[in-house]
Curated annotation (Swiss-Prot):
Chain positions of PPR repeats: 68-98, 99-133, 134-168, 174-208, 209-235, 236-271, 272-306, 307-337, 338-372, 373-403, 409-439
Protein name: Pentatricopeptide repeat-containing protein At1g28690, mitochondrial
Coiled coil feature spans: none
Record-linked NCBIfam families: PPR (TIGR00756)
Transit peptide region: 1-19
Record region (Type E motif): 444-520
Molecular function per GO: RNA binding
Keyword Transit peptide: yes
Cross-referenced InterPro entries: E_motif, Pentatricopeptide_rpt, PPR_At4g14850-like_plant, TPR-like_helical_dom_sf
Chief localization: mitochondrion
Similarity field: Belongs to the PPR family. PCMP-E subfamily.
Keyword list, A-Z: Mitochondrion, Repeat, Transit peptide
Amino acid sequence: MRIFRFTSISPRILPSNHYSTFPLKQNVSSLSPAKYIAGALQEHINSPAPKAGKKIHADIIKTGFQPDLNISIKLLILHLKCGCLSYARQVFDELPKPTLSAYNYMISGYLKHGLVKELLLLVQRMSYSGEKADGYTLSMVLKASNSRGSTMILPRSLCRLVHARIIKCDVELDDVLITALVDTYVKSGKLESARTVFETMKDENVVCCTSMISGYMNQGFVEDAEEIFNTTKVKDIVVYNAMVEGFSRSGETAKRSVDMYISMQRAGFHPNISTFASVIGACSVLTSHEVGQQVHAQIMKSGVYTHIKMGSSLLDMYAKCGGINDARRVFDQMQEKNVFSWTSMIDGYGKNGNPEEALELFTRMKEFRIEPNYVTFLGALSACSHSGLVDKGYEIFESMQRDYSMKPKMEHYACIVDLMGRAGDLNKAFEFARAMPERPDSDIWAALLSSCNLHGNVELASIAASELFKLNADKRPGAYLALSNVYASNDKWDNVSKIREVMKRRRISKTIGRSWTSED
C-alpha cells in the first residue's frame, strides 16, 4: 500500500485547525501549504507527545496533497519518534531517491529498537544505491555490533571492516566515530587496535578514556588503565567509576577500589549508584565488614538506599563478610525485592551455616511469586546438602524442570551427587552420576571422590578418581591427596606409595590450606 504519491496533482489547501499550535504562532495566509504542513509537523516532532501529528499524515493522504522531500523527511522523523517503524519505513520506501539524511534517520530508528538485521540490510541497500555512508552512518553500524538485544550473529571482524571502509572512503574521524570505533574494539577484546584509534584523537574525549580504562581493567591490565586515568585531564564521575569498579574485581586490587572511592570524593565528586555498587563489591572481596558498614552509612544519607540494586549489593556484602544478621536486616527493609535479592539472601544463609533459614526463605520466595533462577536452585540444593536433607534436595532438583522448565546444569547435578554422598548414599550417588543425560564433568567426580574420602569407600573412590584424572589430571592436585587418604584409612599403603610416586613424577604438589577441589 502506498502512503502517498509523488505524482503531479495540484496541492489543495488543507482544511485543518487542529494540527498544532503552529497556526497561532504564524500568519497562515502568508504561508504556502507545503510550508504550513512542514511547520506543523516540526511542532509535533518537537513536542513531548508527537503522536497527534499523525493526523497530518492522514489528511495528506485524504487530500491527495503532493509532499515535497522536506515534508517526507519530517513525516519519517515523526513516525520514528512515535515508535512506528513500519510507517516510517513506508514513508522511506516512497521516496524516489532517499537522501543520506533519510537513510541515517531510518538506520538510527532500527538501532534504537535493536533491529540489527534490518539496519545492516538498509546499509547494504544504501551502498548499492550509490549513496556514500558518512561517519554517522558508520558509527551506527559499529553501535549495532555492540547491541545486546540482537540475536543476530555478526562477524567478529565487523569492526575492522568498518574501520577499513572509513580509511578507504576518507571519512572524517570525528568524536562520534572515534568513540564508536574505540568502544567496539574494546568490547571485542582488541585493545591494541582500540589504543591505536584512541591515540588519533585531537581533543580529549572522556567517553573514550572511560572505554579504554574499562577494557584494560576487564583484561587485567591495571597499569595501562591507570596510565589512561592519570593522563585524563578533565575527569568526571564516569571515569572515576570505571576505576573503582575495575579495582573492585580482584582481591589484589580491591583495597585500591576503596582508596579511589575516597579520592573521588576529595576531588569533589559525589558517589552515585554505580559507585556505591562497585565499592560494596570491593568490601565483599576484602570481607571488610567495618568498611562496608561505613559505606552503608553513607548510602543511607545519599538518598539511593531504597534502590533495589543497593539493597541487593549490601545484603550480598554483609553475607560474604559473615554478618548474616545485618544482611537479613537489609533484606527485610528493602521496599522492593527481585530474584537476585532473594538469591543473595538464600546463598548467604547457606554459606554462613544457616541451611534451615535458607530453605525457609526459598519456600517463602515462591509464595511471593518470585521465580527462582539457576543460582537460586544452587543455593537451595547446597543448603539441603549441608542439612543432610536428601529427599528435600532431590524434590527441589526435580522441580526445576517439572515446575519451571529449567534444564539442570552440571553444577546442579554435582550438588545432588554431593548431597547423596555426604549422607552416605555413595552407591546411589554413583548411579545418579552414571544415569546423567550428559557425560559427567570433573566437578561431578570430584564431589563423589570427596564423599568417598569422607566415608572411606575405596572402590568408588578409585572409580571417581580414575574418571577425574581422565578429564584433568594435572588441574586437580587435591584429588590425588583425597585418594591417598582413602587408601591410607583402609591401610592400603602400597597404593598410597603409588599415588605419591605419580604425584612426584608429574611434579604435582598439594598447596597447604587450599580446598582439594580448587584448581591451580
